[in-house]
Amino acid sequence: MIQVLLVTICLAAFPYQGSSIILESGNVNDYEVVYPRKVTALPKGAVQPKYEDAMQYEFKVNGEPVVLHLEKNKGLFSKDYSETHYSPDGREITTYPAVEDHCYYHGRIENDADSTASISACNGLKGHFKLQRETYFIEPLKLSNSEAHAVFKYENVEKEDEAPKMCGVTQNWKSYEPIKKASQLVVTAEQQKYNPFRYVELFIVVDQEMVTKNNGDLDKIKARMYELANIVNEILRYLYMHAALVGLEIWSNGDKITVKPDVDYTLNSFAEWRKTDLLTRKKHDNAQLLTAIDFNGPTIGYAYIGSMCHPKRSVAIVEDYSPINLVVAVIMAHEMGHNLGIHHDTDFCSCGDYPCIMGPTISNEPSKFFSNCSYIQCWDFIMKENPQCILNEPLGTDIVSPPVCGNELLEVGEECDCGTPENCQNECCDAATCKLKSGSQCGHGDCCEQCKFSKSGTECRASMSECDPAEHCTGQSSECPADVFHKNGQPCLDNYGYCYNGNCPIMYHQCYALFGADVYEAEDSCFKDNQKGNYYGYCRKENGKKIPCAPEDVKCGRLYCKDNSPGQNNPCKMFYSNDDEHKGMVLPGTKCADGKVCSNGHCVDVATAY
């Protein structure tokens, strides 16, 4: 039985209008002072654990009472979590600290469906919560013999530099397909049954400049990294992702690479070190370097796109440019989003009334929301590229997170989970037991209507292309059947292409996606450039070397398009970027001749390819 702690925060709530105070988060010029008083609900004589699994905090914000519900983030650390630093003489020191009884929580505000919270309860309460669509921060004031805390808004923190900050990735994403509904981009029923989430094992590296910035206080650095990881973990849940911290390395006796303001150089150097050094010592899926170096220009983060699970490129670099944890954690999640195949948002992407996390310019208001575009691109990457490293289930030495009834996550042993009894809005689910109510066949799923299985034949997943037929309910389950595609190699689009993994890839669509309307497949003569084997014209890469196309394979290298748009007359237009050399290549499965498709940079017979 989880013991519940009730803490009443008595407010001597007086905003200091016009006055300021220096906190860990910076110079704050408008805040409320609160004095937490812990009132335990444990039975008399019971032993109180150091950090409870679940807690409630009652307090007031702007004179209004609120109740903050918190649950320990038991998936924050992997069971084999390790920490490495270096002695003054350069010796590597690795430890495996006990992290089960940690003090990092996620939560929500009672009766506020849009609320979220990420709190450290290690030494007082530190973190942030969202209440009535506004983000508030709470932090101990650290006055002698006082339990005083400050509550304040981000807008009241003085900024050292008001100049706009940006991600260094310069690519934009365009789509020739209509926006897909989130319900159509789901993991198969079999995958959902055993593993509804994807699990990213995150490794954080802290450079020497960060150590200097923190006066060599390794404990302070560790606490900050835990807080950042706790927030990143919370943010990624919007994508049905779970980031567990598997390791932390602090370059306390000098950097292992040369960290420069040049983000291209630093990202590539870190990626190479990760591949040749870190991966040989510690299994992980993704690594991020946090540095106090000031990157060139307004850039504060940089990453490879669509590289999750790659032995070298599943990395990102982030500048620790703000003392506010939420701000830096948002950048970390943004860059990991790039690794997960997400590009920057464009004008047609939406997060409702909130700024989006994947905007190219960092918003003045920290946002934890991914747009509809981000969701689509992430799961499109996962379903098409199938990165294997994030499929491992949270068992054994992986994430330790037992089911918790009432957290609105469907976990092992639960038939449904609609939140707490006071917040549950699912008429099929008993919130107290996380079991279906009597007479209910289901409580969720694309084939569940009014607590009953949908009739057999009801469409539950629309056709997304000629090669992807619609799926229909069976009448025996609440889940939509697994997404089934037509056989690879089946002709499609009036024989202009062949089916490949549910799509019908043709060069016209790929040109449209890269350059927009009035752009078409170029003449055959343009593709001869792919025989050069130079930085852009090649068919494939082997051990880092670009292999020129054989004459019969030229249509399976770089894509060339004819641009007839107003003001343009480019018969051999192509796309190339140092950030993502693969973008602009002809996609696998594309028709390259009658009866032939592209496969690994070769134009081969359909029967051979499939």
Swiss-Prot record:
Which ranges carry the Disintegrin domain? 402-488
Name the keywords, alphabetized. Answer: Calcium, Disulfide bond, Glycoprotein, Hemostasis impairing toxin, Hydrolase, Metal-binding, Metalloprotease, Protease, Secreted, Signal, Toxin, Zinc
Instruction: Please report any disulfide bonds recorded for this protein chain, giving both cysteine positions.
Output: 309-389, 349-373, 351-356, 405-434, 416-429, 418-424, 428-451, 442-448, 447-473, 460-480, 467-499, 492-504, 511-561, 526-572, 539-549, 556-598, 592-603
Q: Where does Ca(2+) 1 bind?
A: 201, 285, 389, 392
Q: Which residues form the signal peptide?
A: 1-20
Positions of Zn(2+) binding:
334, 338, 344
Question: What does the cofactor section's free text say about binding?
Answer: Binds 1 zinc ion per subunit.
Q: What is its EC number?
A: 3.4.24.-
What residues sit in the active site? 335
Q: Name the organs or tissues of expression.
A: Expressed by the venom gland.
Taxonomically, which superkingdom?
Eukaryota
- Write out the function statement from the record: Snake venom metalloproteinase that impairs hemostasis in the envenomed animal.
Tell me the subunit arrangement.
Answer: Monomer.
Name the chain's protein.
Answer: Zinc metalloproteinase-disintegrin-like BITM06A
- What's the source species for this entry? Bothrops insularis
